[in-house]
Amino acid sequence: MKISMRIVGVSAIALALCGCGGSEKKAAEYSPKGADGAALAVGFNQKQIKAVQERLLGEKAKEVSSSLMKNAPEEVSDVIKKAGLEDAEVRWGVVTVGEPKLKEDMDLDGVPEVMVAVSLDIDIEKVVAAFREQLKKEAGEELKETTVAGVKAWIASDKDLEKQKVSPTFTALDGKLFLAASTTASLEKLVALYRDGKGQSAAFSSFGLPADLLLRLVLTDIGARVKKSIPKPEETLKIVSQFVPNGDKMILALGALDFSATSAKDGGVALKLTLKTGSEKDADQLRTLAKTGLMPFTAQMKEAAKEDAESKVYAELLEALKIAGTEGVFEANLAVPQAVLKSLAENQLK
């Protein structure tokens, strides 16, 4: 049985995320800063901004961009002062959301995808505490409406996706605060829209989003959905008890299951699954079952790795998986390097 980490059919993937900063010459580009920084980001990358400006009315688009750049500092400073965060380093840029089908005769009043994005280098806890309500009051609804409009325009190119629901949300991820838009369409379907003529994916460059960050989004989404979709104890008790002694106690403890995906110092991601079983005996038994159960899969993947590069990656991940925990708590930890994340992302898109 081959273990595959390819992610298919995952819904509610957050879109419209990219970092921002720079000056009038250099608009939004995302750059991970680690857990000690924070960013409010809406928009896409520099190439898309230039493309939209060119497709709009040339000089008029530049005039609007210059106006936004000129006025942004004062507006941002005002919000900073109201939030009591005068020491925050602020950068801004003109960005676009989505890839709307623009007609040559369309004026800027009909294009809500041009806006100002702001990057704040401050502690995420301060951002969440001081800015969340402020953002909702000052610009929340406007940004949400614009983001949704951009995403809807983007998915309108596919009849199936056109029917999918789109909803905006404020999201804290990897030490950053984002305004995101999510859709019920599958990751596979979304990625398919961004394949170029040679079958190679342009998804990450089009998103302006690093592969490792996209994978963290997906993994976090999976963890949340696994936790939410755990069956009620009475529905699965009989099945579990056939394989695990004292399974009734363990299944009742599944409500304490927690999954997290956080940024690692090397640019990778640290995955952690924690389950409070209620007793050290049950936790120890679960650790034993996990370790012995993984052994044959690891051996099989090692064998397959001799001829398959993808299997080699999975074999290394299985070996890196650490089963731990004490005092009635079961833990499974996996540190995935940045290079492996990118490799997995590339395999997902083939």
Task: Identify the meaning behind each predicted range.
Residues S23-G150, S263, V329:
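Long, low-complexity, Ser/Thr/Gly/Pro-rich intrinsically disordered segments that act as flexible linkers
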Residues A39, A264-G267, A283, A304-K350:
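A cross-kingdom marker for long, charged
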Residues I49, L57-E89, G93-V94, K137-D266, ...:
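An internal, short helix-loop-strand segment that often contains or flanks glycine-aspartate motifs
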Residues A51, I122-A129, E280-T288, L341:
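Short, conserved charged micro-motifs
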Residues M1-G9:
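Bacterial N-terminal signal peptides that target proteins for export
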Residues K47, P100, S119-D123, K159, ...:
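Solvent-exposed coil/turn segments that connect beta secondary-structure elements
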Residues A16-G19:
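C-terminal motif of bacterial Sec signal peptides marking the signal peptidase cleavage site
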Residues A38-V42, V114-L120, L215, A253-A261, ...:
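One face of beta-strands
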